[in-house]
Swiss-Prot record:
<comment type="function">
    <text>Converts heme B (protoheme IX) to heme O by substitution of the vinyl group on carbon 2 of heme B porphyrin ring with a hydroxyethyl farnesyl side group.</text>
</comment>
<dbReference type="InterPro" id="IPR006369">
    <property type="entry name" value="Protohaem_IX_farnesylTrfase"/>
</dbReference>
<keyword id="KW-0812">Transmembrane</keyword>
<feature type="transmembrane region" description="Helical">
    <location>
        <begin position="137"/>
        <end position="157"/>
    </location>
</feature>
<feature type="transmembrane region" description="Helical">
    <location>
        <begin position="192"/>
        <end position="212"/>
    </location>
</feature>
<dbReference type="GO" id="GO:0005886">
    <property type="term" value="C:plasma membrane"/>
</dbReference>
<dbReference type="InterPro" id="IPR000537">
    <property type="entry name" value="UbiA_prenyltransferase"/>
</dbReference>
<feature type="transmembrane region" description="Helical">
    <location>
        <begin position="39"/>
        <end position="59"/>
    </location>
</feature>
<dbReference type="GO" id="GO:0008495">
    <property type="term" value="F:protoheme IX farnesyltransferase activity"/>
</dbReference>
<feature type="transmembrane region" description="Helical">
    <location>
        <begin position="302"/>
        <end position="322"/>
    </location>
</feature>
<dbReference type="Pfam" id="PF01040">
    <property type="entry name" value="UbiA"/>
</dbReference>
<feature type="transmembrane region" description="Helical">
    <location>
        <begin position="166"/>
        <end position="186"/>
    </location>
</feature>
<comment type="similarity">
    <text>Belongs to the UbiA prenyltransferase family. Protoheme IX farnesyltransferase subfamily.</text>
</comment>
<keyword id="KW-1133">Transmembrane helix</keyword>
<keyword id="KW-0472">Membrane</keyword>
<dbReference type="GO" id="GO:0048034">
    <property type="term" value="P:heme O biosynthetic process"/>
</dbReference>
<feature type="transmembrane region" description="Helical">
    <location>
        <begin position="63"/>
        <end position="83"/>
    </location>
</feature>
Amino acid sequence: MTKEFHAVGERSVVTTAVDAPQARHARRPAELLKAYAGLIKPRVIELLLVTTIPAMLLAARGIPSPWLVIATLVGGTMAAGSANALNCVADADIDQVMKRTRARPLVRHTVSNRHALVFGIALGAGSFGWLWATTNLLSAVLAVATILFYVFVYTLVLKRRTAQNIVWGGAAGCMPVVIGWAGVTGRVDWPALVMFGIIFFWTPPHTWSLAMKYRDDYERAGVPMLPVVARPTYVSRQIVVFTWLMVLWTLLLAPATGWLYTAFAIAAGAWFLVLAHRLHAQTRRGEPTKPLKLFHLSNTYLMIVCVALAVDSALSLPVLGWPF
């Protein structure tokens, strides 16, 4: 370990939420509905689905069947909801320590841990059956594999043990584009993997900027996020590195798209690079920083790229010839 890092205070966070005290069930239907909605984390799902539609449009070289799009989005929502609900069960012990997550349903005991576990498993099984029936077996298998990876590899292993947790664990968040592509074509082609890579490189700057803001929260919970174990200048430098990788990676889609996507990818990439470099410069000078601003603007950046890709694909603009 280099001098850029320091140790994290140890804390026992290995107990599961299933062993938590009996929950106080929500009393009203509206309260119960809100609690279960909180388990699936709708805002996270919304971002994932935004990346699915452009992948399907590019795979179809135009506009695919509306029914296929709806079916894939429904299945993807169920799969993401399953992963998020199971994540809430596994992380209930650290959620109750962190100020940012203390309002979650299992922490407030509006849903029992057992019911949340059953809910998550049911959503996962439902997503498999739904995607198999409405799209194809490959999409269904990829969805279940994503759930298992997110829960057992990221949540239970990587998140609590390594500062690189979000780098490798974030691969689960990249899968909706692959599932969407497979839903249209029945296979996984190179453009799907390129889109996977865009989100893979986007995830660290997005998450580390949030973790910079809530560093004390993560440290209190014993989660070794990079901003917890590394110096701020090292973290901001890594954000710059991954931002460059992300922007350059977006250009790999140029041969499979038209001028509209390429122009927006370059412009949006240049804008986000300026933001990342500005954060790093402020960190190096010891000036006050606003990492949460970068976090929110990273969502804007991804939205711009995805919308440009969707419009470009829907209009079937000239293709330079991607080998697939």
